[in-house]
Every structure is written in C-alpha cells, then in structure tokens.
Amino acid sequence: SINDFTVPKLFELGMAAKAENRLSSCVVYAWAMNRFLRPAPYLQYIDEQKYIKFIKTSFSEMNSKFQFPFNIGDIKIIGFQIETTDNEGLIPIVLYLTEFDLNDPELDKKARQAKDKILKKFHGLDHDFEYLLMRAYNEMPSDPKKKYNVHGTVIKLKD
C-alpha cells in the first residue's frame, strides 16, 4: 500500500475520479493499483479481475485521449508518469522537451507559468494530489540503455 491506500481504496478513488471526468487522476490511481495488485505471488484480491479491467480500461482511455507528444503552449509534452514517495504518496509527473539549458533557473519559472495550461489538459490533478512534477529533457528519452540529463520542477498544487 501507499500511505495506507490499499488496492480497494485506490479503486474507489479511481472510480470517483472517473465519474467526475478526472481521467488523469484516474490513471494515477490505476497505476498505483497495478503496482500493488499482487503484494506477494500467492496473495490475490477477491476482486482482482475487476481491478485489472479497471486498470486496462483507464490506461486505454488515457492513450486514446492523449496522443503523445503534443504541445501545450510552447511546451512539448512527451509523456506522463507516476512516482511514489513515503511522505507525499502518489506524484504525477509530466515529461517534456525543452531547448533551455537544464541548469537554467528560468526553466523552473517557465514550468510554473505553464501550470494552469497543464492542469487544464490533465484535468483533476489539482483536485486529487498535492504536487505535480514537471520533468524536462533536452532530447527524447527513447533509449532505455542511455542515461539522460533531466531537470525536475516541483509544483505545489494545493495551498
């Protein structure tokens, strides 16, 4: 579990997000469900098939709605990921390409300025999560064997 969120609780949150048209949040919960669905090889939730169907449907809807890459203003969005932390729980991550030097302090400013446009496209994230991470790359991270330079900007979603 993550921050005491079990798979049944994540399913409940995901269904609520889906019912309120917050697909991006729904996918975050589905991702977490997928990660924790089988806590051990011999353990299985009674409703596992229902959870698997929800996970697959959520991912499929996300993939059909968001044809990566796409532009939001002058930011080229290349992907969407999720990470977990012990303190903050689930953190949605928007991956994007930039021509700026990854050490340029303006990068954080530009990412924060794009917050409203990002949240409009990824509707619901500000309703369900405390933070959003914007992860910038100078080139498409397409080779799994290659190490890429990256710059992250944490955006607080709730005051």
Show where each model-derived region lies:
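Hydrophobic beta-strand segments of well-ordered beta-sheets in folded domains
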Residues: 27, 91-96, 128-134
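Short beta-strand edge/turn micro-motifs at domain boundaries
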Residues: 1-4, 120-149, 159
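Alpha-helical protein-protein interaction scaffolds
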Residues: 3-62
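Short glycine-rich, basic-tinged beta-strand/loop micro-motifs
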Residues: 86-105
